[in-house]
């Protein structure tokens, strides 16, 4: 069983190799807008899970996730060969590709935080003109007890 530091180093190296191979070696137009975001390795260093995101050709255009997944699936053998050549280990890990959902999750979390900030601002505006209920000084003191001390 390999240590976690070696697995992390190998995952980082695989991320770099796959990203540069997609950019330079793989001639598939469907992979133009694919970004490799992360790679995780199993403890035995036999499997690597490659996470990727896809952006659209423009800001308004939606990304074509299915086409990118199909292109990565078709290029998996070539990518594994390139990783094996550049990695220099006895066993080349099996590469599986998974869409990275972190950007969507972070956008959702940002929307929730924005909604909470707006609600806090509304409450602060309501609080500005508010007066406490009841007496101004709820702790009444008798004049006798003050003079006795």
Swiss-Prot record:
Region Disordered: start-end pairs: 124-149
Keyword field contains Cytoplasm: yes
Signal peptide as annotated in the record: none
InterPro entries per record: KH_dom-like_a/b, RbfA, RbfA_dom_sf, Ribosome-bd_factorA_CS
Alphabetical list of Gene3D superfamilies matching this protein: 3.30.300.20
UniProt-recorded Gene Ontology molecular function terms: ribosomal small subunit binding
Cellular component GO terms, alphabetical: cytosol
Subcellular location(s) of the protein: Cytoplasm
Sorted UniProt keywords: Cytoplasm, Ribosome biogenesis
Transcription as UniProt keyword: no
Pfam families: RBFA
An annotated GO BP: maturation of SSU-rRNA
Family affiliation: Belongs to the RbfA family.
Known role: One of several proteins that assist in the late maturation steps of the functional core of the 30S ribosomal subunit. Associates with free 30S ribosomal subunits (but not with 30S subunits that are part of 70S ribosomes or polysomes). Required for efficient processing of 16S rRNA. May interact with the 5'-terminal helix region of 16S rRNA.
Identification of the protein by name: Ribosome-binding factor A
């Amino acid at each position: 069983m390999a240590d976690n530091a070696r697995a992390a180093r190998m995952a980082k190296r695989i991320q770099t190799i796959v990203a540069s191979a997609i950019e330079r070696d793989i001639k598939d137009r469907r992979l133009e807008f694919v970004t490799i975001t992360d790679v995780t390795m199993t403890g035995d260093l036999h499997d690597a899970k490659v996470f990727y995101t896809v952006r659209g050709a423009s800001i308004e255009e939606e990304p074509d996730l299915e086409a990118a997944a199909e292109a990565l699936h078709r290029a998996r053998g070539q990518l594994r060969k390139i990783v094996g050549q550049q990695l220099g280990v006895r066993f080349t890990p099996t590469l599986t590709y998974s869409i990275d959902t972190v950007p969507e999750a972070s956008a959702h979390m940002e929307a929730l935080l924005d909604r909470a900030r707006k609600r806090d601002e509304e409450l602060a505006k309501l609080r500005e003109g508010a007066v406490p209920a009841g007496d101004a000084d709820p702790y009444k003191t008798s004049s006798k007890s003050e003079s006795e001390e």
